[in-house]
Every structure is written in C-alpha cells, then in structure tokens.
UniProtKB/Swiss-Prot annotation:
InterPro entries: HupH_C_sf, HupH_Hydgase_express_prot_C. It comes from Azotobacter chroococcum mcd 1. The lineage of its organism: Bacteria, Pseudomonadati, Pseudomonadota, Gammaproteobacteria, Pseudomonadales. Coiled coil: none annotated. This is Hydrogenase expression/formation protein HupQ. It comes from the Bacteria. It holds the Pfam family HupH_C.
Amino acid sequence: MIGTQSILPPGFGPGSHGEEDRLDYLPMPREMHTFERPSLPEPEQLDSHPIALALLERLQEALTAYRIGEQSRVIGLDRQPKADLKLLQQILGEGEVAIQVGGQRPVRIQETVLAGVWWVQLQVGLGEVVGQWLEVADIPALVRRRAFAEARWPRLGATLPDDLLNAGPVLVELLEAAKQHAEHASATPHVINLSLLPFSAEDQRFLAEQLGEGPVTVLSRGYGNCRIASTATPGIWRVQYFNSTDRLILDTLEVTAIPQAACAAQEDIDDSAERLREIREALE
C-alpha cells in the first residue's frame, strides 16, 4: 500500500501553503473528480472590483483564441490589487492538476476549474510569491522549458549488478528511445509498462539511480491519482497511476516531451471557454 505522503514531494500538496497570495492544494480525492462550479461571489461584491471582471474578460478572449500547439496566452497578475486577485481565485477555483517545478526559483502551478487555465506562481525562500500569472495552454511553457534543462545522459558501467532481473534491458531500451526522441521528436510516446514485467526492488533502485530525479512533479487528480515526474535523463518521465485507495495500479516510463496525462486537450480548452461564459453570465 502506498500512502498519500509517499507520492508527494516535500512542500507539495495539502497544508504546504499559507493563506496570503498562496495557492491552496486540495486533499487527495477518493472518488471521481468532476467539474463543479466554484462558489461565486455575489454580483454586488464585484461592483467595487472592476479589475477582477476585466481579468475575466481578458481570460475569455485568451481561451477563445488559443489553439493547442500555439504559443500560450499569458495574463500578468503582479500589479493587480490583492483583493481583486482573491476574488479571481474564488471564481476560478482549483482543478485536477497541480505542478511543482524545483530549482533555485521554485514554481507552483495550479490548474483552475477551467481545464487549460493555469495559475502560475514563482516563489523564493519559504514560499514567498515574487511573480504570478494566468496562462492558457495545454501545459505552461515554463514546464516544457525546465523539465530537462539540466538533464544528462547516465554513464553505464561495463557490468551490471548480479541481482537485477529486467532493469538492464529496460534501461537500454529507454536510452535508445530517448536518443531517438532527442534527434527526431515524435508525438507518439515510447512507453514501457513496468507493471507487466518481473521487476524487483533492486531493479527499481538501480533504474532510479541511473535515471535520476528531475525538477518537475505533476499530480493529476481524476479517478484516483496520477503522479508524473521528470527524470534527470532527457525525455524520460515516470508515470504512475494510483486507485482511490492510493494503491499503485500502473507503473510506466514514457519517452516524450510531456506526458499527455498532464496536458489539456483542445476539447478541454473549448469547454473551458464555454464554462467561463456561463460563469461571467452568472456574475452579471
């Protein structure tokens, strides 16, 4: 049995943020996550916060115009009044996907209830927010830029440990696929399903040591949970699926730019544009 805390990195998830200008991450779900309109403020509350309404209008324009594969649409929030941002957070709520990007300038990203609309926060120190914006995209551009910015190819020894079952062949296959991907990126991921292989604890340890840990961790919440983590090897991701009781049910490695489980589709974007129209109408 794998518990909730074992699949979340330190400082990521419920209880990791204060209230002021921070994103609040929801507890791990126990059942199917479906769209629920967030608790909206009364229209009269917005009368004194026209900036929040203006930001929603800009977001509507961005959602309507954006197409998957294009440059993401960014709406800066740094100079906006805190009261308006608080209302905006209330209106947009929290969606299925949360992302942490490590490094000297950590980044926390929370998808809103509108799939493909991301609230991005740059942080320093103990979580002080030094920059934030809304981004309309399949996944924020910063995630793509930093996932493998400092990745390196592992150096294999002449011999492998004697106690391995399948880690050696799996690693060779992964590295060959990753090098092909680096030369000629393919939209189709190369997937190895470890759940179907005899794979010992020694295999897991050896593979983890060789691939290393990357800076990006994604938690996607739907029916159960999906944890996606970049490795320190170019193009290789660990993608793990857990059921509603946190039991690991599928353990895979993917060679791809970004696993599709982390991304919004064009259908999601179009649906979010319609939902935002409904929300704005309810606020009139």
